[in-house]
From Swiss-Prot:
Subunit structure: Interacts with the late transcription factors VLTF-2 and VLTF-3. Interacts with the late transcription elongation factor H5/VLTF-4. Interacts with itself.
UniProt-recorded name of the protein: Late transcription factor 1
Coiled coil: none
Transcription listed as a keyword: yes
Keywords: Activator, Transcription, Transcription regulation
Record organism: Fowlpox virus (strain NVSL) (FPV)
Keyword Transcription attached: yes
């Protein structure tokens, strides 16, 4: 069983995710006809995208599968393949490897006769396939209780000024989300008006690690403004902030968990 993907799509995905992590987890859901690409960045941060299985991304198996892919290694070896190649990705869980292979065929003139000429490439990369990530992707789509917009440069500039702190307090007031430094001396406050608002938010306050917010620096090359929403589960528990980005036509989700 292997995953076959056109090299331009593969390059697009591994280039994006390698900005944040050396490896990702690939979860193929045959019934839903999609694959999930997931990475955990530390600091209670998860990043994932959902890719439909189609002619550009094809899986020939009949059962769901999960494997790990070393995106940084893959990115660095894609120059070995033809620019029009379709790359097959096969995981070997017993030997902790993943293999990329492709056969590219062209017609060449040989004594005035067109004959096929094939070039084969196979690259085996080591990665721990015993690790597994349990992540409920649908949990963060269940319920939204607020939305706002973050200007990335301004947010990063704000947290640069408060690097001596470990976390920010998050609270809500008068249709605004407030980021506040702890304590009463040298207090820094940043407020964001909310495009969607629930009055019950005023009953809550949380913490978020500055370490987590600093992870957003990886988006600085491609994102000016982040749309974000505050998500809760079906039981009404507020979970954290969900940011949105794109890789071409694919939506990317970045989730930061709140701390009580």
């Amino acid at each position: 069983m292997s995953l076959r993907i056109k090299i331009d799509k593969l390059r697009q995905l591994v280039t994006y995710f390698s900005e944040f992590s050396e490896e990702v987890s690939i979860n193929i859901d045959v019934k839903s006809n999609v694959l999930y690409i997931f990475a955990t960045l530390g600091g209670s941060i998860n990043i994932w995208t959902i890719v439909p299985l189609n002619s550009n991304v094809f899986y020939n198996g009949v059962e769901n599968t999960v494997f790990n892919l070393p995106v940084l290694k893959v990115k660095n070896c894609l120059c070995s393949f033809h620019n029009d190649a379709v790359v097959s990705i096969t995981a070997d869980h017993d030997n902790n490897t993943v293999t990329l292979s492709s056969h590219y065929t062209v017609s060449i003139d040989c004594n005035n006769e067109q004959i096929p000429h094939s070039t084969g490439t196979s690259i085996s990369l080591g990665i721990d396939q015993k690790k597994s990530y349990i992540f409920n992707f649908h949990k963060y789509e269940e319920k939204c209780c607020g939305r706002t917009v973050f200007h990335l440069d301004m947010l990063l500039g704000f947290i640069k000024c408060i690097s001596q702190y470990q976390y920010l307090n998050i609270c809500f007031d008068d249709k605004k989300l407030l980021l506040k430094t702890p304590g009463t001396r040298d207090t820094f406050v940043r407020s964001y008006s909310m495009t969607e608002w629930s009055p019950t938010l005023q009953n809550y306050s949380f913490k978020i690690a500055i370490f987590s917010l600093n992870k957003l620096r990886g988006f600085k090359k491609r994102v000016l403004v982040f749309e974000s929403k505050i998500v809760m589960d079906t039981e009404g528990n507020i979970l954290g902030l969900l940011f949105r980005d794109r890789i071409g036509t694919y939506k990317v989700n970045v989730f930061m968990a709140f701390q009580d």
